[in-house]
Amino acid sequence: MASKGLPLYLATLLTGLLECIGFAGVLFGWTSLLFVFKAENYFSEPCEQDCLLQSNVTGPSDLKAQDEKFSLIFTLASFMNNFMTFPTGYIFDRFKTTVARLIAIFFYTCATIIIAFTSANTAMLLFLAMPMLAVGGILFLITNLQIGNLFGKHRSTIITLYNGAFDSSSAVFLVIKLLYEQGISLRSSFIFMSVCSVWHIARTFLLMPKGHIPYPLPPNYSYGLCSRFGASKKENKAAEHETKELRSKECLPPKEENSGPEQQQQQEQQQQQQQQQEQHEQHSFRRCALSRRFILHVVWLSIIQLWHYLFIGTLNSLLTKLSGGDKVEVSAYTNAFAITQFFGVLCAPWNGLLMDRLKQKYQKAAKRTGSSSEAVALCSMVPSLALTSLLSLGFALCASIPVMQLQYATFILQVVSRSFLYGCNAAFLTLAFPSEHFGKLFGLVMALSAIVSLLQFPLFKVSPESNAVYVSMGLAIFLTLVHPFLVYRECRAEKTKSSVDA
């Protein structure tokens, strides 16, 4: 990392962290916002009509139509949050950072303005606004993940930190709920969020690149405000060429790097030509997307994510059932859940630190054995993948026990496992596949997992009345341990191959 650009890099890092923690993943604070919507009588007409027909007989069934509408909104929004990542990931890869961020700002601003001016009479507009909010938020995250490239060996830590900040941003809706209870209207809160778009625009042009942040980072790399007053286009093109050279050198086995100057030059030229051909064949987007490694990762993410979405979407109904309809207790537990979400930003970096430390350890071993950098990266992912599956399994087991006080432990396991899940997902795609396909692969894995997430709505009709769904999800999560096991076998096979070649 160049010391000259350090202040700019830190400014980009910190403002990106603020953007993710304050805006990107607010959708997942749905439980807190739902409490406000219910207080404002959104979708309450069907319930009132049912109550009149039943001669003032009230109970959980009276609110089912209202809960189903809210569940459907969250299902659609969470689906769009994931599914639209594929086309937006393509836009990010094809049209670069500035265009992607301007699209994100447009969707996000429109969504917050629509929510600000909704009421009980226009509650149907939430079916439009919440998906738009989700799409804008995920695009903020995608464009910020590349900031990890500025910090070299700390790359995984930064990526997981940003994913943790994405998780923590769900606490924003808790703040809106608390402000609402103090007399500040929902409209005022969302108008303030709309005005913040000015800050997003300023950051886009001053602290973010027009294109992509390369990895490895070339010397004298500049972007944003500095590129407008410093480096020229020719210098930036030279930096891109230098990045390609650095990337090709990283792929060289250690024993070939130590040969004589003339032989090394010839070998490098030959190997660069071979690598370009091999990378085109072996690392094409189609080849990556159809690989067993990618397919297993999609299954791993889809199952665990479905459980998280189902839990968030049904939490209000679950708490109402366990508390016997006590609104004060439901509010207290809703606040507790939202507060735990904020600590996702503190949990996620531990996963990144684990990956970075293991990667450094395996790199030292690779210098002795001649293992490829790809094998080293995969080895560093195995413990994180396994730990994420185990945490999610514990979360599912706690949630399946119908004891109100135990839900505090459930909330803690939920936030830790969720922050590990998305950090692990982004880091795995970054380390296990070529960086030029990251946007498309990240989008594809989220789009495919989004299709699976649509199951949460039919499951919602079962879960409040039965624990069978929780038990089934627990068994499915247990099976996700197959993914880290097969990645481990792949690493072992690569190590064996390297030792035989040596």
UniProtKB/Swiss-Prot annotation:
Residue spans crossing the bilayer: 17-37, 72-92, 97-117, 122-142, 156-176, 189-209, 294-314, 335-355, 381-401, 419-439, 442-462, 468-488
The keyword NAD is annotated on this UniProt entry: no
Tissue spec. comment: High expression in the heart, followed by the lung, liver, spleen and kidney. Highly expressed in adipose tissue.
Domain of life of the organism encoding this protein: Eukaryota
A GO-annotated cellular component: basolateral plasma membrane
One Pfam family from the record: MFS_1
Catalytic activity from the UniProt record: adenine(out) = adenine(in); guanine(out) = guanine(in); hypoxanthine(out) = hypoxanthine(in)
Family: Belongs to the SLC43A transporter (TC 2.A.1.44) family.
Protein name: Equilibrative nucleobase transporter 1
Organism expressing this protein natively: Mus musculus
The encoding gene: Slc43a3
